[in-house]
Structure formats: C-alpha cells, structure tokens
UniProtKB/Swiss-Prot annotation:
Primary localization: membrane
Record-linked SUPFAM superfamilies: F1F0 ATP synthase subunit B, membrane domain
Gene label: atpF
Protein name: ATP synthase subunit b
Protein's UniProt keywords contain Cell membrane: yes
Keyword Ribosomal protein: no
Gene3D superfamilies for the chain: 6.10.250.1580
Protein localization: Cell inner membrane
Family listed: Belongs to the ATPase B chain family.
Length: 156
C-alpha cells in the first residue's frame, strides 16, 4: 500500500517542516509580532502621556493667561490711580497758584490804592494852597506853612 507509505512520508515531511518552521521561522515571527505589539503599546502609552501633558500644559497656559489678565487689570487700576493722583496734584497746584496770583493782585491793588491816596493828598495840598492863594490874592509862603500842609496831608 502505497497510500500508507505516502501518508507516512507526508507525515515525516510535515513534522520536518513543522520542526524547521518552529525552530527557524516561528521565533523571528513571534519576536517581530512581540516587538510590534510593544511598539504599539509604547505608542499608545506615549499618546496617553502626551494627552496628559497637553491637558497639563493647557491648564498651565490658562492659569498664566488668567494671571496675565489679572496683572493687566491691576496695572490699569494702578495707572488710573496714578492719573487720579496726578490730576489731584495738578488741581491742587493750580489752586495754590491761583491763590498766589489773587494774593499778589490784592497786594498790588492795595499798593496802588495807597499810592493813589498819597498822590491825591499831595494834589489836595497843592489845590488847597492854590485855593488859599487865590482867596487871599497873594502868594502863600510854602516854607512857612510846610508843616501845616504836611499835617493837613496826614489828616486827609
């Protein structure tokens, strides 16, 4: 029976082929599949770590953005406060300057009033002398009556 010998030969060839595949082909295939599996697992783990890092970086960026916004608001508030203080200082300086100018003007006016009174006293004295001269139709001696005129001037 050739069938048995053929079957037996096929079984021997099968086992030899199986042994060759198990010995030489199967380990590199398993190794390649294991390496591929580990690379995929590492890639998935790296992707997960990347997602976590992205979420962390996103949170940090949001915190930094909020911090920058708060600092901006604070700086604007400080600038407004400084501007308000500067405006108040300018207003106070202007009021002080206005008070000084008003005081100076009042002093000048008082001095002008005093000068005008002195001028008027002198003119009144001269007019009084001329009036007396005309009334008496004679010349009044200015030296003789100088003290009298100065006293009159002081009274006016």
């Amino acid at each position: 029976m050739n069938l048995n010998a053929t079957l037996f030969a096929q079984m021997i060839v099968f086992f030899v082929l199986w042994w060759v595949v198990a010995r030489f082909v199967w380990p590199p295939l398993v190794k390649a599949l294991d390496e591929r599996s580990s690379k995929i697992a590492d890639g998935l783990a790296a992707a997960e770590r990347g997602k976590e890092a992205l979420a962390l970086a996103s949170n940090e960026a949001e915190q930094e953005l909020n911090k920058a916004r708060q600092e901006g608001v604070q700086r604007v508030a400080e600038a407004e406060k400084r501007a308000q203080m500067s405006a108040e200082e300018i207003r106070a300086n202007a009021q002080a300057e206005a008070a000084r100018v008003i005081s100076q003007a009042q002093q000048d006016a008082a001095q002008q009033v005093t000068r005008a009174r002195e001028v008027l006293r002198a003119e009144v004295a001269v007019l009084a002398v001329k009036g007396a001269e005309q009334i008496l139709r004679r010349e009044v001696d200015a030296k003789a009556h100088g003290q009298l005129l100065d006293q009159l001037k002081a009274e006016l």
